[in-house]
Amino acid sequence: MAIKKMWGGRFQEGSSKLVDEFGASISFDKHMAYEDLEGSLAHVKMLKHTNILSADDADKIIAGLHILQDKLANGELTFSTELEDIHMNIESLLTQEIGDVAGKLHTARSRNDQVATDLHLYLKNRLEIVIDEIKNLQKVIVKKAEENVETVMPGYTHLQHAQPISYGHYLMAYYQMFQRDIERFEFNKKHTNISPLGAAALAGTTFPIDREFTAKELDFDNIYANSLDAVSDRDFVLEFLSNASILMMHLSRFCEEIILWCSYEFGYIELSDKYSTGSSIMPQKKNPDMAELIRGKSGRVYGHLTALLATMKSLPLAYNKDLQEDKEGVFDAVKTVIPSLKIFAGMLDTLTVNKDKMLHATEHDFSNATELADYLATKGIPFRKAHAIVGQLVFEGIENNTTLSDIPLEKYKEINSEIGEDIYQFLQSKVAVQRRHSLGGTGFDQVKLQIKNAKKQLNL
């Protein structure tokens, strides 16, 4: 026998099983059960505080909600598809515990402001976790950077050797990206930490509710100023998905370089066995599957952002059933982002840096060409002319399989008689890196300064 719908008073026929299954959201919004109970507790306490409900009725409801909280914590609650969503399921379970007085809980409240409140609470809590995990990753980056301040490697543009840099400097570039991610999520908290509770269906309520009371109970910083906006706003969700997409993009870029650099052709790093997998047919394989998975999962989060933008783009005010589609993407994004951060931090912390291979790559290429052009410019040669001269020398080196350091001093003196033996020191990769002392540059002192500032930021 079908369960009678709590909203079924004006209907003469029951809905079909297919409609029930298609419209039900309990399969995923059960993830907000904790938040739904928290919101209901705040609401009933407010109803008691304002004398909308008697103390006796309110206390019975509060006691029943606490029982459900305990059962939820112990995994003892069972939800029904026929009851549609988490709100109806909780009310039904509460009725089983305390009887018909449970029906008074929904006084001065709609599922519209109820679900909005649940989602705000859910995301508010997860934002803190995401920010903490980013900071944990930053700590690993700082540790690894400190170990590799003087590790010299090729810097790339267009994936071609450009100029030698410090590997620590490279790592600190990602530290800055993740710091911007933190700042975006912190701003996201401002728009998430607002209470929609009390907006009711869309127009507020005739009951003398106290929205400030419930906001304080739920530790919200602010209250929606407009009831229509309160129940229809999903900007805070879009902000989260946008921020999560940018964060995953940063992780994906980092993963791409890890995947390249642990290959035989590069050999700059080696991943720990703990974060690698093998092949079912090729015994020699050690695959960077975790890095590849994180790179792949970035597209998953992008998809959730695009889907919700498409859902929201034509919705008239206020609530529409389309908004049921706002949750699965958020839940999945949370379940994607947090493990990705944890796994990446562990992968980075345990990888081995092949310092000799990195340095060797800078000593048998032409990434010191800019150093030579700068050196010639200090001898009075206009930089554009120096650039052309060095370009010709590079071409000749490629033709003859020699480097700029192989060119004899006599050849250099033909370019400018003031060139001395010191030119060969300037062409050394480590010297080239050391000399870049401009603020934010790759010079060792500058990298140490970046690390010092990061430690201060992280309270290390």
Curated annotation (Swiss-Prot):
Catalytic activity reads: 2-(N(omega)-L-arginino)succinate = fumarate + L-arginine
The entry's family comment says: Belongs to the lyase 1 family. Argininosuccinate lyase subfamily.
Q: Does the keyword Lipid biosynthesis apply?
A: no
Which UniProt key words apply to this protein? Amino-acid biosynthesis, Arginine biosynthesis, Cytoplasm, Lyase
Q: What is its EC number?
A: 4.3.2.1
Q: What is this protein called?
A: Argininosuccinate lyase
One BP term from GO: arginine biosynthetic process via ornithine
Query: One GO CC term of this entry?
Result: cytosol
Gene Ontology terms, MF aspect: argininosuccinate lyase activity
* InterPro entries for the chain: Arg_succ_lyase_C, Argininosuccinate_lyase, Fumarase/histidase_N, Fumarate_lyase_CS, Fumarate_lyase_fam, Fumarate_lyase_N, L-Aspartase-like
**Where in the cell does this protein reside?**
Cytoplasm
Record pathway: Amino-acid biosynthesis; L-arginine biosynthesis; L-arginine from L-ornithine and carbamoyl phosphate: step 3/3
Predominantly, its location class is cytoplasm
Domain of life (superkingdom): Bacteria
Q: What class of enzyme is it?
A: lyase
